[in-house]
Amino acid sequence: MVMGTPSSLDEIRKAQRADGPAGILAIGTANPANHVIQAEYPDYYFRITNSEHMTDLKEKFKRMCDKSTIRKRHMHLTEEFLKDNPNMCAYMAPSLDARQDIVVVEVPKLGKEAAVKAIKEWGQPKSKITHVVFCTTSGVDMPGADYQLTKLLGLRPSVKRLMMYQQGCFAGGTVLRLAKDLAENNRGARVLVVCSEITAVTFRGPSDTHLDSLVGQALFSDGAAAIIVGSDPDTSVGEKPIFEMVSAAQTILPDSDGAIDGHLREVGLTFHLLKDVPGLISKNIEKSLDEAFKPLGISDWNSLFWIAHPGGPAILDDVEKKLGLKAEKMRATRHVLSEYGNMSSACVLFILDEMRRKSKEDGVATTGEGLEWGVLFGFGPGLTVETVVLHSVPV
């Protein structure tokens, strides 16, 4: 047996790695055609769940919807389907089979819609895709949604797949962190990332003893987003980054046990939220910013462009207040919350898309609202925070 010399191993490792940072080369989004107008939703929700007798609770839910700052949400579940599946409309009735039957089919399908758009924008043959990262909080099967997507798109059978289930709202940051490592450590890699979320697993009727469940019913919605990530873009074929990823970190916030919990049981996926989630995030967010931007010598948070998971308006309000952010910093985030609701892991990718679109429309110098450096935050169960440092590119 011939042992390789350290120098030759070093050379092999160096040759395997990319030279430059991972960049987001394309973005695509998709939503179910069915949508609800938030102002009309309380009447619809209490009618479809046979809960119109719960008048006080309905008034509370109306106030939640009013405060949500959401205008509309897309949902796969239609009134006709819910009428045919009354157990999904009860508060805690066994209904997992019906829910799973929907999402194991529809999550990959919605993901495919977003992926097709991203691949079209990228402009390269899909045979160049080397890795697939698929993320969803909805539905678990083997083989998983990553396999189904690979088949639906007709990707090469040798594509390297990674499936992320049950991560929750912070996972839009997680997929970027993983895709960054894959792209930078595998020369020539092109990573297709898909986040696809359908609320069929969480929809249920109201309960006057579990108001935290109602919060989710007022916020959550359906959507899928896809990106292509790669290092060393091939400009000869038109590849160009929209944003570059500089660093990525994950942390569990102190004293946050039980702040956000999700449990997949016979009744579907139930979420439990403590009231102090906005306070926990805002109290700890500056530490994450300091750690991420100290190497760059940046401490003025208003000098950054912002992509924050819109868990709800209270989180955004508290973060703005704590950091002294100007109102326009969260414009793209609040726009996505208003037009789409909380689509869990897909949200931050929608916000990236909205930011690059508006930056071009406004004629500013960069994809990051004219600014050079930016931050992307994911918040979710744990309480877990993902922090991604982004670098914009000229428009």
Swiss-Prot record:
It is an enzyme of class 2 (transferase). InterPro entries: Chalcone/stilbene_synt_C, Chalcone/stilbene_synt_N, Chalcone/stilbene_synthase_AS, Polyketide_synthase_type-III, Thiolase-like. Keywords: Acetylation, Acyltransferase, Flavonoid biosynthesis, Transferase. The keyword Acyltransferase applies. It catalyses: (E)-4-coumaroyl-CoA + 3 malonyl-CoA + 3 H(+) = 2',4,4',6'-tetrahydroxychalcone + 3 CO2 + 4 CoA. One of its GO terms (biological process) is flavonoid biosynthetic process. Its EC number is 2.3.1.74. PROSITE patterns: CHALCONE_SYNTH (PS00441). Pathway: Secondary metabolite biosynthesis; flavonoid biosynthesis. GO terms for molecular function: naringenin-chalcone synthase activity. The keyword Cell membrane does not apply. The active site is at 169. The modification N-acetylvaline is found at residue 2. Belongs to the thiolase-like superfamily. Chalcone/stilbene synthases family. The primary product of this enzyme is 4,2',4',6'-tetrahydroxychalcone (also termed naringenin-chalcone or chalcone) which can under specific conditions spontaneously isomerize into naringenin. This is Chalcone synthase 3. It comes from Sinapis alba (White mustard).
